[in-house]
């Protein structure tokens, strides 16, 4: 009886197990066949690149008097970036510290009821020489290394300028450090950018839905801070310095400023055509549709006749591991286009190229201090 029960129950079970194992083997064999069948990258042609853009308002593409070109190109850039007439917001001082002989003031500006943005004002020792006011614009990372918290590729340049006698305003940019998520105080919502972990860069992409760009909104913030700087510290003119994304902003924001005296732009100004597909830059640099009208050389040219330094580290070149690569093959062509614009205004000698030997994507403090002397 027991044998019969065993046969009745065990044999079907063994049969089912055998069938399942056979099915798995067959499925694995079929999957291997399917995998071999699938199209491989090696069978494709993957050399895509966008064709050359029209650049309809680039200086070398238009037949306009220089002054007329400047008016029309500035108006188009203002339209693309959606720069509006703005006033500085209310600013409060949170606290103050003395650091390496410099007084650093922590500031907050109210943009609207849903957003405040920070900045640091660095006041030099009053016993030393008093030099120009400076807007110091950080790159990807945060503002804190510019004022001396740590030494990274910024090399504490806001602090070094203040120690040299400059009155320095160093704003935190949207998308970075304490502003790395503009919806951080809302449950679930995320408008993040440089958060140091997995990110969809929603601060950038959400803005695109409304026709805005992160760089355009940041330019408006810098103009607000400049107005506050002028009104509260009697700043009639100022110098501007930035590196990387801050270098982009050091070229773009002064186009809409009437107070800028000199510009030191590090790690920027090659053509837009290379910064994403060739140099693997992050999306904050993007100005949607810009190449339909102009390139970086034209934007920089809108600052004519202001003296401008374009600075690079000799080793900041394209490679599989370099996500800046600002000193790329488009730099010298862009420089020639910029010089052409400055020459048309009788200011060709006001454009300088400085390449620091043996350096990567990093600020050159001695060259910066010398230029702003």
Regions found by a protein language model. Give the residues of each.
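N-terminal targeting or regulatory segments adjacent to alpha/beta-hydrolase or S9 domains
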Residues: 19-103
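Glycine-rich active-site/cofactor-binding loop and its immediate structural neighborhood
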Residues: 97-153
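Cap/lid segment of the alpha/beta-hydrolase catalytic domain
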Residues: 129, 136-220, 275-279
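Mobile cap/lid helix-loop segments that gate and shape the active-site cleft of serine hydrolases
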Residues: 201-202, 209-212, 224, 260-305, ...
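Alpha/beta-hydrolase fold nucleophile elbow
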Residues: 233-244
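Glycine-rich nucleophile elbow surrounding the catalytic serine of serine-hydrolase chemistry
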Residues: 242-254
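Short beta-strand/loop motif that positions the catalytic acidic residue
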Residues: 303, 310-312
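C-terminal catalytic histidine-bearing segment of alpha/beta-hydrolase fold enzymes
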Residues: 336, 340-373
